[in-house]
Amino acid sequence: MLNSYSPLQSPSSSITLPPLFHINNNNNNNNNNNNNNGHNNDKQNVNKLGLKLNINGYDSGFSPFSPNHSIANNNNNNNNNNNNNNNNNNNNNNNNNNNNNNNNNNNIQSPKNNNSNNNKLNESCGSLNSSNDNNFNSGNDDNSLKRVRVFSNQNQNQNQNQNQNQNQNQNQNQNQNQNQKDSWNIHFGEIVNIVLELESVLSCKNENINQINQIKSSEKSMRSALYKKEIEILELKDKLNNSSATFNSLKVIQPIKLEKSPRTLNNSSDSISENINNNNNNNNNNNNNNNNNINESNINTSPTHELSGSSGTLGGYSKSHILSILDDLDSESSNISSDSEDDEQPRKVPRDLNYKPNNNINYANNNNNNNNNNNNNNHNNNINNNNNNNNNNNNNSNNYHHSIGSITNSVNIKPSKDQTSNDWAAATEALLNLHTNKNNNNNNNNNNNNNNNYHSNNNNYSNSPNTTPPYQNSNQQFNNNQPQSQQQQQSQQQQQQQQQYQNSINKNITTTTNNNNNNLTSSSNNQAVVYGNTSPNQSSANGNNENVIGVPFTGSIVKRKKRGKLPGEATSILKKWLFEHNMHPYPTEEEKVALANSTFLSFNQINNWFTNARRRILPRQLDRKVFGSPLFSHFSITK
């Protein structure tokens, strides 16, 4: 039973309300159905009941939308997660009033449970004074209880809606924050990608800059290299131009080709002896007609080549130029010379001691030329000699040609090539012609009183079968027809000029033919036969001038000058190399230099040794053209 209170009594003193709200709260926590329906019913109930609760004309001051009711707050605190379920429970409560009443009755019987709820209602709702306290306490007014339940449900619904709105706002805020975070995350990723792209672009740009710098540096280096190459090309062009200019200035003369017939050589030798005879007669005041003989004497050469008669020149070339050619020939001839023992043996020249020397070959030659010309008016002295004995002239001519044969033998030494023989013949003839021209321009008038000694010292050999010299009658008649002073003057001039000529010829011919294997004896024959005079010291010791044999025919001169042998250590090194390379025994220039350094020999000695070794040390082969190295391959005049 509820206690009855006075109307003036405050609601907080002893007012007790039925524990319907507590039951409803418990039911709200247990019901989970019909969310939307309950909410709509609450709105309808609120619209019907109004804003304030009037119980029996008394304004209780309770508003279902007041934010200060503790019941709604309690429900909000307990039902944050189940707002919709509370609305459904309210609907169930509205529909089942009888059950609620029963529950209220049951709750009234348990005051302990209702004390807390009543206190909360007293705090929130204020004092509720009613004139019908007994009826209210007794629970007879069912309408008032329904209203209270409706207001409480409405308050609960409002609180639930507010909670829902708050939750929705929180959810929206959370979603917005999440979206902002996601957007910031997206933007940060994009920024990172942009930064990475910028870094890649910068790295590519730096690489491109480095490549451009490398290309520029390579271009600079290429330009510098091209500039250097252009400078080298210009220098090479200058060198080529200079070398071509020097080559044109030092171009070697073409060899003078002589005819192969012995008559051509004899004719050239005739002209040489004619020049000698004419040189002996240049300064005779009474023999002016002999000058015509000088003008008529011509050197017979091949039709395509002519020798100029100017002093010191041959074919437009200077004397020094021709002597340099002869020096080249000398160096070439050393390539053929051998250092072996069989070449050191003396070579004997066959001779016939039954013939006395012909003392007047020059006059015989002069007489022969006068017989060929038949100029009786211009050559009176020679014609007087020719009228006495024609046989003497013929014999003298034969003797002369025989003596010239030794010259042909000396000149016409046949090396391995025809060109070399032509070169030697041309060089010898050019050298002789130079000295004859020199002697023509340098005639002297020195006096010597040894005319008879000169004729006795003239040495010459003749291969004719006559034992008596055929020139004596003509020589005597020639001497008888001339005055003594003229004969003496002529003999003095002849002796002086021939001595000068012989000395100069001996110096040049011996140098050009000293290193040749076959030219030493032939050059000595050339001196003895052509020039026909020796010094008094060269005669034999017995004092017999008629039986004097020329110095070139003695054994000491005929014997070849012995060459020095190479050291045994050097030859052993060279032989070792030769036997190791016997299939191709031709060392290169670098190998020759190396061998020369190792053996302490000269480059020329190495060349000579290998040329001899290929001929004598290695076995001979049939084809020498293939096996042997060609002569004058490096210093040929034709190059």
From Swiss-Prot:
Coiled-coil residue windows: 72-109, 152-184, 230-296, 365-396
Q: Which GO terms of type biological process are on file? A: cell development; positive regulation of gene expression; regulation of adenylate cyclase-activating G protein-coupled receptor signaling pathway; regulation of transcription by RNA polymerase II
Pfam families (alphabetical): Homeodomain
What SUPFAM superfamilies does this protein's entry cite?
Homeodomain-like
Task: Keyword check for Amino-acid biosynthesis, yes or no.
Answer: no
> Where is composition skewed (Low complexity) in this entry?
73-119, 126-142, 266-300, 358-399, 436-526
Polar residues composition bias: residue spans: 405-422, 532-547
Q: Where is this region: Disordered?
A: 1-45, 66-144, 157-179, 262-313, 331-422, 436-547
Alphabetical list of PANTHER family matching this protein:
HOMEOBOX PROTEIN TRANSCRIPTION FACTORS
Function of the molecule: Putative transcription factor.
Q: This protein is called what? A: Homeobox protein 9
The species this protein was found in? Dictyostelium discoideum
